[in-house]
A protein has these predicted regions:
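PAS-family sensory domains
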Residues: 1-11
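Short regulatory alpha-helical coupling segments
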Residues: 30-31, 44-64, 95-103, 122
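Catalytic-core segments of nucleotide cyclases and related cyclic-nucleotide turnover enzymes
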Residues: 84, 122, 126-134, 151, ...
């Protein structure tokens, strides 16, 4: 009977241990599924989930929501010239610069894909968004990352598309994201190394 009881308790203990290990594994898998493997910041899936939540919150509270799309200028040339190891290191460095450029708990920096990053800034006006952009550009200038094959400069630079909205039921979040992407395209068209902010009244481009 004692042996049976010991065996039974051992079985329970083992089962609990296995359940705990499974729970840890599930948390790790959940973490990995939302984390970009290279830069260790949020990935596109995490961005999409967060964007849905913040859009609905901004719509309900009638508060401004800012999106930014950032692209590293002439990154293919950087990669081809320096090799993929340095290219990966560059992506990691930019990711960390972006993370340090925002500080509030709900601000999100994610890798959108390739050399493109996206930022969600809840409760952020256009004026405040410009301050964040300027901080990002200054930090990248200070980092002084060599890019000898860039047609612009010997330093790495970035282009950004930025837009702020107070969403209503009439607005569509995917259409808004496309507008931000269009601003990024305009920033590239107008010489890169800067940003475009667009609203119903004006288009603004400031070279860094």
């Amino acid at each position: 009977e004692v042996d049976s009881l010991v065996g039974f308790m051992f079985d329970i203990s083992e089962r609990k241990k296995q359940e705990q290990e499974l729970e840890i594994l599930k948390k790790q898998l959940e973490e990995y599924s939302y984390q970009d493997g290279l830069t260790e910041i949020a990935n596109r899936r995490f961005f999409e989930d967060s964007y849905q939540r913040e859009w609905l919150n901004a719509q309900r509270e009638q508060q401004p929501l800012t999106l930014m799309l950032l692209d590293i200028d002439y990154f293919k040339q950087y990669n081809d010239h320096n090799g993929h190891l340095l290219g990966d290191a560059c992506l990691k460095q930019i990711a960390q610069i972006l993370k340090k450029s925002v500080s509030r708990p709900r601000d999100l920096v994610a890798r959108f894909g390739g050399e493109e990053f996206v930022l969600i800034l809840p409760d952020t006006t256009q004026a405040s968004a410009i301050e964040v952009v300027e901080r990002i550009l200054q930090s990248i200038r200070t980092a002084d990352i060599c890019h000898s094959t860039s047609p612009l400069d010997q330093r790495l630079s970035v282009s950004l598309g930025v837009k702020t909205i107070i969403p209503t039921q009439k607005n569509d979040k995917m259409a808004f994201l496309k507008e931000v992407d269009q601003n990024l395209y305009l920033a590239k068209e107008r010489g890169r190394n800067g940003y475009v902010i667009q609203d119903a009244e004006h288009v603004q481009h400031l070279n860094s």
